[in-house]
Swiss-Prot record:
Subunit (UniProt): Homodimer.
Highest taxon, organism lineage: Bacteria
Gene label: rlmB
Recorded GO MF terms: RNA binding; rRNA (guanosine-2'-O-)-methyltransferase activity
InterPro entries reported for this sequence: 23S_rRNA_MeTrfase_RlmB (IPR024915), Alpha/beta_knot_MTases (IPR029028), Ribosomal_eL30-like_sf (IPR029064), rRNA_MeTrfase_TrmH (IPR004441), SpoU_MeTrfase (IPR001537), SpoU_subst-bd (IPR013123), tRNA_m1G_MTases_N (IPR029026)
Primary subcellular site in the record, as a coarse category: cytoplasm
Organism field: Yersinia pestis
SUPFAM superfamilies: alpha/beta knot, L30e-like
Record's protein name: 23S rRNA (guanosine-2'-O-)-methyltransferase RlmB
Subcellular compartments: Cytoplasm
Residues binding S-adenosyl-L-methionine, per UniProt: 196, 216, 225
NCBIfam families: PRK11181.1, rRNA_methyl_3
Top-level enzyme category: transferase
Amino acid sequence: MSEIIYGIHAVKALLERDPQRFLEVFILKGRDDRRLQPLIAELEAAGLVIQVASRQWLDSQVEGGVHQGIVARVREGRQYQENDLPALLESVETPFLLVLDGVTDPHNLGACLRSADAAGVHAVIVPRDRSAQLNAIAKKVASGAAENVPLIKVTNLARTLRVLQEHNVWIVGTAGEADHTLYQSKMTGPMALVMGAEGEGMRRLTREHCDELISIPMAGSVSSLNVSVATGVCLFEVVRQRGLKA
């Protein structure tokens, strides 16, 4: 099985991490871009043959996405499942997980993955049937983070949260009506941050399995933030509390 990836950051990240997955690489005919040329040189140095294509053909491959003049067909990457969780939890000293409940926009999924990678999150967990797919759009927005952060798809999110609790992971859910703010919460131990769908929030069962609910204090007239923005705010409060170093 193969899949399409596109954009300079997404292609470069996969080349650095797993060059064996590349099958074909196409670049825009006549494109002379100082950001693209070094990547082309790296691809050729890895033994890949670069093919030239028209803008119309490249556009047809990316479903309206911004390809930046480069599209690649690659072998599908590893698919993480819920049975991968125990080994992951045992492999890190202080697990830091992100759970997305009902984030169905691939742009938001990609942005959350990018923030998760920057914040040092060990894995992102999503429900199999109520989540955006990790498609080419999500990978483009993630700017390479999709190759670094495991995306674990689970059949039953509530059951997965129970498994995390059995491994002493504290479940922190976000809810606009919560009296306790993220700045009042201690988030230095093993934890999973749960973000709900924009507008709807977490589902009832997901909320019931949280150990703690927190909110983001809002000073202006807007009542909520885009889910990817809210995710970034919460993740980096955890980073601040933990004093993580680059």
